[in-house]
Regions:
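Bacterial signal peptide processing site
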Residues: 19-21
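A short, compositionally biased
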Residues: 36-41, 74-78, 119-124
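Internal interaction segment
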Residues: 88-152
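Short, surface-exposed binding/anchoring microloops in extracellular/periplasmic proteins
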Residues: 47-76
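Extended low-complexity, serine/threonine- and proline-enriched intrinsically disordered segments
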Residues: 76-89
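Bacterial Sec-type N-terminal signal peptides, specifically the leucine/valine-rich hydrophobic h-region
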Residues: 12-15
Length: 152
């Protein structure tokens, strides 16, 4: 009996090790960075050197539109959800390649999106893709500045 249980546990562990890596996964050293320029403002959750990012939000100043880019492992599904303090929105994203030929999912939403409004108020943001979620550290001040630059 115990051998059957141990064999089952071993098989489950072996199968678990073959599971695909989550599409959404942050490195421990990642942090938010806000990059305002004359033509575009970008809020990125990235490594300190800026060489790898998980999520980028960008907009032309006062355009009312926000571009969402999820820097992720190649994904078969292009449905991404963002959640902030109880608000949740889903976005149909386009799979493609970024400037460094890295896989990305990209889409556009309005600066008036309820999730982005809550993100600006609370700094709380969680990203979901392909059944996996990643809570990002609070960034209220940077989120508020970013959203203020995007609103009409």
């Amino acid at each position: 009996m115990h051998r059957k249980i141990l064999a089952s546990l071993f098989a489950a562990a072996a199968l678990g090790s073959c599971a695909h890596q989550p599409v959404v996964a942050a490195n421990a050293d990642m942090a938010w960075s806000l990059r305002p320029t004359a033509g575009e403002t970008t809020l990125r959750f990235e490594t300190p050197r800026g060489d790898a990012a998980l999520l980028s939000l960008s907009c032309e100043p006062h355009s009312g539109d926000v571009d969402i880019t999820l820097h992720a492992a190649p994904a078969r599904m292009s449905l991404v959800a963002l959640s902030s303090d109880g608000q949740r929105s889903r976005y149909i994203m386009e799979a493609g390649l970024g400037p460094a030929d890295e896989p990305i999912l990209s889409g556009v939403t309005k600066a008036s999106d309820p999730v982005l409004q809550r993100f600006a108020e609370t700094g709380d943001l969680m990203v979901f893709a392909s059944g996996h979620g990643q809570m990002l550290p609070l960034a209220q001040e940077k989120a508020a500045k970013f959203m203020a630059s995007c609103r009409r």
